[in-house]
């Protein structure tokens, strides 16, 4: 049931973002190597082009009632990077709530949910400068009963010949989001009620870039009307985009 649930959410997020987040980007997972197999190699345009026809979330068919999911084209792959950790946070939060806990935090990678208070004060989170060598904090926020999700080009990345390559791939081009575009944000942060929502939107906003991110935020707000915490702020000093 959990597999079908998270695939359903991933399919919905793909549709919501018009493919900026695309659950079928897994077709590129062995072309670019940013995980345990990272070797700083750059795939050829021919290698990337051969995989692009295999990326299309509309060809993932999920039948929640029957408990089935399948990809309509041979060679396609579903990949839960960009939403899976957020979903895991949501599940953990539900377990904590069901256990009667009111004040707690749950974190999985760049996805953090905080509930209630930390002792006698609100939860305070520091936002790190993604280019600072010492991990210095450039902004702080207070929040409760919300998920804070970050996506950026500073982890699972490498620099080669002065160009930064990172693991957040644009499903439309098969290349790292914003590659070669100096005005692209270094990182994106999304504040939302749900972890899967925040995780998927931060990934999509990183792919969409600064101009299109506002439209994503409006679209999500219209669809998730109960999620009033979403907001868009720009921190130009370190090129963070907070949604």
What are the language-model segments listed below?
Residues 1-243:
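Mature catalytic core of soluble alpha/beta enzymes
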